[in-house]
Amino acid sequence: MIPNNINNRKKLKLPELFKEKYGFNKKGIELRYCDGEKGMGIFSNRKFNKGEKIMKIEPYVWSVAKHAIVCDECLKNKLDLEEGKTLKRCSNCKLVYYCSTDCQTKAWKIHKQECKILSTIPSTTDKKNINTKSTTMLLRLFIKRNLELINNNNNNNNNNNNNNNNNDNHITGQYEIIDGLLNHKDIRSDNNEYKSFSSGFCSLLGEDPQLKAPIVLEYLLKLEPNCITIPRCEASSIGLYPLMLFFNHSCKPNISIINNRKELLIITNKIIEKDEELFINYSPAICYRNERLDNLKQCFFFNCKCTLCLGEEKIKSKDLYITCNINNCGGRINQEIDININNNNNNNNNNNNNSNNNNNNNNSNEEILKCYKCLKVYKGQEKDEILKKKLIIKNLQNKLSTNTDQININQEFKSLLELYCKEIHPTDPLFYEIVNKTQLFYLGNNNKFISDNELSTIYHPRYQIMIKYHLLQVQNLEYEYCRQMLDYVNTLATTSYFKDALNILTDLMSNHLSQIDFYGFNRDELLSLLYNLQHEYKNNIKTSRKIIN
């Protein structure tokens, strides 16, 4: 099952493969060689408008976590099923589930070969401290490779195959793309652990570890940094999308990825000119700059040199998410080096002596606070007062780090939250943590400490502002905005805020969801939810009138 070798990356003709087999050129994009260290990238061969759909992609192989109760074929969980239907477990391995006979039939070609092996994986992989998902991914990768080899041998006269290539280890397609990936094994700090696992994996398949373990290790190190977590699926499902692997990273990408379970839809989030490279974001969309750079280095093994990072590096930008309240500006204040001081001084003092030039160099390193919106520069005492506001974030982080069951929503916490919302800019990543935590506060036992008026003035407006600003305006993720707001609609309905929930859902369905053709959402379910909210709202009004009378 395990291949005898891996194709030489230098011999692969990937640009031709992407063009001829996958029709990238017909989609308005093509694979090209890049300048510098990036190797290859995806470029546009025509102009794209904002919000334009480029392509849909399915994973080559995928996997879910051990013991996850989710359909192994379509990734539906029990909440996604129609009433009366359940997920049924494979009677043999008792590890994978299916939601229907149709899904089980689709998966059978691969599962019939992996079933016996999967049942022995837990006892093997737990000892090696390797994620079971990676084990399953490897197993399915090799099974699918063998199936493709059989198909190639049976159809070697077909024009779509690689001209009767007699090398039974050669497959022209997505598997070949995987062969061409870098493994970064020279800079991996955990190689010994993976080597141990690779030997165990060979033994599991009844193959000679001495011969095949290096091959397994090679693929394992290729898979880990190149698998994509599939959002909105239970138990952190992961997928390997070979056709996605040559989209390079930018912290300010020009395309976005929308998922409908396994399927990924690539859309533009800005106007893209012809011959412009297309970028996606490998790191979490909302995180502090140092966390973003550390994540890229640790998980993807490169120092980011995108335009955003180079610009931040040039001005020595530091994470600072404080709101500019001058004349109700509302812009974000950032901490940086004033690179203009040195230029201005040089223009005014061209005839100065060396000592003056040294002074100018010292001045050029002056740190300033600058509003990105109104361009006001804060210095001296004003700057010191602004920097003191960082304590607000620190104090709130300390509060949020406390176990949510033990936090009392007292006046101190509410005052701190109000101060945070007033002084800290909505793009601050901590807003996400606040939303998640306060949702537990307000829906848990502690909600008795909060009146309806306080609930609407503190929690709900900030939730909406944070989501709308961050996900819609900053990241241009219309889909993600809809998903988050639908979660919010359910939260409002749970707490009997039927009118608010009804207004938001009506706006979503009329505007935002219609813009993405309800992609990834069930229109009938949303119409049913809309009807139920209307019904609950009318009943709520009738009940209120009876109480008043």
Curated annotation (Swiss-Prot):
ZnF (MYND-type) residues: 71-115
SET domain: residues covered: 27-283
One GO molecular-function entry: zinc ion binding
Keyword Acyltransferase listed: no
Presence of the UniProt keyword Membrane in the record: no
Record GO biological process: methylation
Any Gene Ontology CC annotation: nucleus
Name of the top EC class for this enzyme: transferase
Alphabetical list of PROSITE patterns matching this protein: SET, ZF_MYND_1, ZF_MYND_2
Function comment: Probable methyltransferase.
Record family assignment: Belongs to the class V-like SAM-binding methyltransferase superfamily.
Protein name: SET and MYND domain-containing protein DDB_G0277331
Organism: Dictyostelium discoideum
